[in-house]
């Protein structure tokens, strides 16, 4: 085995990648990049019954979205391909048959009916379910419906050093004679992962904690096949806020769902890195470069990580605020075009959106929130109750007088920019013996149709002279029609 660090992310396309799965990919990627090694993607598509169309594409889309580039794998190739297990079946059958020939595995002819009945009886006796080794010493040959099982050593222990958990020991007698080759000729995970990790010269296996009980099986296979095993590190579970296993009842679990909800890839990389790893007890925001520099297995926790949705939203808001206006605009447009009011306005373009984004950038936590905060800056189809133009401390006529005075002052401006507008409207409030907030509130409703909106004068500048004055004129007309 080479001294080079070679790690793999080996998802099964039996569903769309969830956050725990992608967290595993990211820790492998960070470990490879930190050590100057290789990150390999291998698609473990041997479970044909549970195979989901589109799952592979979703896996690769998730990796690409997060910027987790791979050195070998689908779309890249490499010296150790193919990188789909369904294209490597001959290797697994070869290994399984060698183990049978050497007396380390055997054909099992037990029917599914017998196995089901045996399992039911074991459960009824409150025994741990497992194969009773009926065919272990029968020297059976291959036949239709037969599987190949591995002969577990019936004595002794299997001990290994987990790079996160330290020394771990399992009693061999408590292990099952597990299936390594199914009746359809496809391998189980246990055999395929061992054969491929050896063939692809994987140096370290970083995987979810749920695979820890399988490790003795894999180490026995390595020994039986005469392979040198990689080093193992089992990553902590991710739990929901209620400390139960993270699931759909806590919220979205698919990585693509977070993309569609308007989370940034930078946020997700940062946030997922902190689910089980910490640089210190206070730093929470890391650039990709810093994560690569700081990441090490010594700082990965043994205990489960808690998924904090509030923290994710906070972090996403922080990252949104670091974006330049053009960058935010380009990311915002796919979300804004889903809003019919904005899409129909004819103003959804990059240049205009670049002007709009700074108005609301400080107020959002997700890109999906943008449209509701700015649709009225795009669309002229704004509606409101004209009575809302009347300040609560003024009469209708006093409010109308104030709006007319503001319109005249704005119409006379040489430069229709935020600074000029405020320089002329703020003193006008004093002249009218109003508080600035009273006059600003009437202008906000008149120009946007909203009681709460982005900064007033900056919004009016983006709307432009013609649209802004047109809206205020319309407000004056609507207010005039109300009874005094």
UniProtKB/Swiss-Prot annotation:
Its cofactor is Zn(2+). One of its GO terms (molecular function) is zinc ion binding. Binds 1 zinc ion per subunit. A motif ('KMSKS' region) lies at residues 245-249. Zn(2+) binds at residues 108, 110, 135, 137. ATP binds at residue 248. Its EC number is 6.1.1.17. GO terms for cellular component: cytosol. It holds the Pfam family Anticodon_2. GO terms for biological process: glutamyl-tRNA aminoacylation. A motif ('HIGH' region) lies at residues 11-21. Keywords: Aminoacyl-tRNA synthetase, ATP-binding, Cytoplasm, Ligase, Metal-binding, Nucleotide-binding, Protein biosynthesis, Zinc. It is found in: Cytoplasm. It is an enzyme of class 6 (ligase). Its main location: cytoplasm. It catalyses: tRNA(Glu) + L-glutamate + ATP = L-glutamyl-tRNA(Glu) + AMP + diphosphate. It comes from the Bacteria. PANTHER family: GLUTAMATE--TRNA LIGASE (PTHR43311), GLUTAMATE--TRNA LIGASE, MITOCHONDRIAL-RELATED (PTHR43311:SF2). Catalyzes the attachment of glutamate to tRNA(Glu) in a two-step reaction: glutamate is first activated by ATP to form Glu-AMP and then transferred to the acceptor end of tRNA(Glu). Monomer. Belongs to the class-I aminoacyl-tRNA synthetase family. Glutamate--tRNA ligase type 1 subfamily. HAMAP family: Glu_tRNA_synth_type1. This is Glutamate--tRNA ligase. The gene is gltX.
């Amino acid at each position: 085995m080479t001294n080079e660090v070679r790690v793999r992310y080996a998802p099964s396309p039996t569903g769309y990648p969830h956050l725990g799965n992608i967290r595993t990919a990211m820790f492998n990627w960070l470990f490879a990049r930190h050590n100057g090694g290789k990150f390999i993607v291998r698609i473990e598509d041997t479970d044909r019954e549970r195979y989901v169309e589109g799952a592979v594409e979703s896996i690769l889309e998730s990796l690409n979205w997060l910027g987790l580039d791979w050195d070998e794998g689908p779309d890249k190739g490499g010296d150790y391909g193919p990188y789909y297990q369904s294209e490597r079946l001959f290797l697994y059958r070869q290994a399984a048959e060698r183990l049978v020939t050497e007396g380390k595995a055997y054909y099992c002819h037990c029917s599914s009916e017998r196995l089901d009945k045996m399992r039911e009886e074991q459960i009824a006796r409150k025994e741990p379910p497992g194969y009773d080794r009926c065919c272990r010493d029968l020297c059976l040959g291959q036949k239709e419906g037969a599987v190949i099982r591995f002969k577990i050593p019936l004595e002794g222990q299997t001990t290994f050093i987990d790079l996160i958990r330290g020394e771990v020991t399992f009693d061999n007698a408590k292990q099952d004679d597990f299936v390594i080759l199914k009746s359809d000729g496809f391998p189980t995970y246990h055999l395929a992962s061992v054969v491929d990790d050896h063939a692809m010269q994987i140096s370290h296996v970083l995987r979810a904690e749920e695979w820890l009980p399988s490790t003795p099986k894999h180490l026995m296979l390595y020994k039986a096949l005469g392979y040198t095993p990689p080093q193992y590190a089992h990553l902590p579970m991710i739990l929901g806020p209620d400390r139960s296993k993270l699931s759909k009842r806590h919220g979205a679990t698919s990585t693509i769902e977070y993309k569609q909800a308007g989370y940034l890839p930078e946020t997700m990389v940062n946030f997922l890195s902190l689910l089980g790893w910490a640089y210190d007890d206070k730093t929470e925001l890391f650039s990709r470069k810093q994560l690569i520099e700081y990441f090490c297995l010594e700082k990965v926790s043994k205990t489960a990580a808690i998924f904090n949705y509030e923290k994710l939203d906070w972090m996403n808001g922080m990252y949104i605020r670091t974006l330049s206006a053009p960058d935010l605009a380009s990311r915002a447009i796919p979300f804004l075009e889903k809003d019919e009011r904005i899409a129909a306005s004819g103003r959804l373009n990059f240049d205009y959106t670049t002007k709009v984004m700074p108005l609301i950038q400080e107020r959002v936590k997700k890109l999906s929130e943008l449209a509701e905060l700015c649709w009225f800056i795009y669309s002229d189809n704004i509606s409101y109750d004209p009575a809302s133009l009347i300040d609560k401390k003024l009469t209708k006529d006093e409010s109308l007088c104030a709006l007319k005075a503001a319109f005249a002052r704005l119409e006379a401006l040489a430069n229709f920019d935020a600074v000029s507008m405020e320089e002329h409207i703020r003193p006008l409030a004093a002249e009218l013996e109003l508080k600035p907030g009273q006059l600003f509130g009437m202008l906000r409703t008149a120009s946007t149709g909203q009681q709460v909106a982005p900064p007033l004068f900056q919004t009016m500048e983006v709307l432009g002279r013609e649209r802004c004055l047109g809206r205020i004129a319309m407000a004056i007309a609507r207010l005039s029609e109300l009874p005094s």
